[in-house]
């Protein structure tokens, strides 16, 4: 089922321009659940989350201060082709491998690839600052199970110890052989 199901406490607006959903808004598509206090639905297929959102899928949780979801194929009957989700001030947790990341800007495309600008990631537990890799750009590629960084700095106990202009790592913390 590729339909996007929407629930909200209230709905206001004009179908020819923009509809605003507010109060405990939930958007569901297959195993995807997005919750937000308010969502603006625009006629061109863009959904805006100006008051933040939380996205949940099996093994993935994302949160952000605001977001924009371009539903490119909404009018073409193919629900995920070309979809792009952009989140500002994002936090991501991948439960399967323990990866945690923060980002000034995060973009997620239809292939599940996460592109992070001004971000940091670690496999350490919350509250543990054992190590983190901060980077100008991070790419988490689910299909190849790799993290690619550009302009990275390795921090141990929050102290920068190594600059890495380019680095490719396995996404799974247990796959140390590739590291």
Language model features with spans:
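Structural signature for solvent-exposed beta-strand/loop edge elements and short helix-capping sites
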Residues: 1-179
